[in-house]
């Protein structure tokens, strides 16, 4: 910047509370931030984001970005801020007091935080409202119009002492004009008017630059007796940038649309579905939304990754976000996507990868990538071209890495009115967004997904949605959200039952094609049975060997069925798989099941094995069952479960050569209580009504789903059905209302959009922690997660007997980091009853009290701080909130009401 600063050299920008001999003049922090903004634009920002920011040429964007960095803390040039920050720096205070007294009523300072003050000062100097609002929002939340409007008049004593107005206005003018001239402007009138969408992205970039420039590891403070020197620039910024070493944007290479290149990348030639996807994205004139509806196991993941390469290469995207329904599915696909990401990264220009969910730091594969895994050995280290960059490890920075694999929550949070949401928009705007299992979200989550799609459509972010079982109505909602409701009403693509089906947009046009399958289909026979009939069916089906899967809707039902089968079929091996196992136990079971009934499993491993599980079997396991029993569930999920039946080609025992699925049901006039609690009556009733005797796959997948979900096109179905429908629809409306209370505004309907400002943009933001925010995008009661350890009769604390050899851990001191990581992995989500509104406070209160009395020192461990420890006795039982809990290796966690507790 031009060396014209005079009076403002004495203003303080940053101090060190622990070392009063250091400070940073305000001008230096502004120069640091401006320099980082420039480098982010030149070297880190993908081309697609530059276009979305609305400037016709990069130099204009660069000038505005540098201006924002150089002026963002002008609100610190106020008496309220300077009087406060200089309390502990008498020498620097003395310099400033030679120019002006620092008298400021302490009780009023909160009314003018420096971000708000900065916006007010810029508006005073006729800066465009949108630019000023970015400064007001740079701490993560835009200001309210009311708060900004009365700042200089209502709280003038926060801006300058009585009689000192001209002195402080001179400060503002000097800073503003210096920054303007450095950026090539002569006056604020030359700054562009932006719309709120462009301002969201620039705010995200400014927050990022400010965080980097505020890190003393990159930008050290200087001795308090120094004022800094212009001669240090740009070398000071260059050193920091080199030390930070952010990865460059991903530059996808063209050519993957060629079948030979595809085969090199993935190890097999593209099938009909994959070829259709690649043709669509290779010929589209503009980025858009693409929805692929295709059967389980057809290679949708590879199709999506190849399409992402094509679109990134054509439209200048700098990364990929891959979102999945659960942590288990994200963990399951992470090694696969890591392998793909390695092919996209060069050793000299490594890309950053991020596993983004609440328990990512417990994922062994992810830890090994960081060199932190507890099982890491020199000869076992794999060479990867991607890296886990330190700067992206924070939750709010997660989406800024090049390749992000995580739960769909990371995308949904971009639609939540939450502080610093602009960082999520910045990260997503530069990526191809892939959402797997897009049918798997309820009405509440879909509200957030739709709002996120509206913003992604505005930014022209390519979006790929994958599903095997998508209702046509939902397909239409997704496309219309991306196009901001601009689609043609009642267009044929909205009701198509073709399958596999590809729907995509090219500008305003919606295109669609049914893909002729290039592999033979299969017929699955369906029967129904009741619970008492189950053992006989499995005895008959497994008479000559083979394996069976039983998928039910609740953990309690799974445990009950497993016990029934163990007693009725003692010659068969019955394994349980559900969500209420400890993390290590569940991982061990998953690995065992993948080895025994996965794609490459041998007959001798499969024979006489019955796996009983819950929805996690349909979501996270690539298993191949010889026969399937599933509890009645909504048709789309039932078809997902059938996708685990005869999944791969293999030789099967004679009674199992015909694919057969038995549907476990209670009868015509009732539903299982647990199933009803999970899914409600209406969709269960509709599925039962349209359940066929056989299904031809894949052709009949879509027609069956549309039958169950297309009730609007039917005549009323009688009093019982109408009552269930009304209850269902009322429930969905309530879910929508709850979600809409916390959504960010739509891109084009923000009530101040015509004023081109972010003010009032996020007034429904609540003070939510990261876990609370993640919970806000999922409906229902909060879940309670615990770490499970054992307390023996002598009071010593141990791992469970089969975990870490049952070794002891000191209770009176923080565990060493490696031990703390092992403890943190003993995670278990308690059953839903423990999170109910009438129960959860008591649960947490009892656990916290027990932890304070026995394990207070563990809270000093960074990995264990804030965790709740459930201590089991020597019989692996515990009492909690009026419940008796028991854990064992075979069944997981079971619970029942305490017999002596009459009041709960």
State each model region's role.
Residues 286-308, 441, 467:
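Walker A/P-loop
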Residues 256-293:
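Conserved pre-motif I regulatory segment
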Residues 131, 475, 532, 536-539, ...:
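C-terminal helicase lobe and adjacent C-terminal extensions/tails of nucleic-acid helicase motors
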Residues 426-432, 439-512:
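Post-DEXD/H (motif II) to motif III coupling segment of the RecA-like Helicase ATP-binding lobe
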Residues 2-254:
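Accessory nucleic-acid engagement/destabilization modules that flank
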Residues 337-402, 408-412:
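A substrate-engagement module of RecA-like helicase motors
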Residues 486-558:
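Conserved interdomain linker/interface between the two RecA-like ATPase lobes of SF2 helicase motors
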Residues 318-342, 355-361, 470-474, 555:
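Conserved Walker A/P-loop ATP-binding site and its immediately adjacent core
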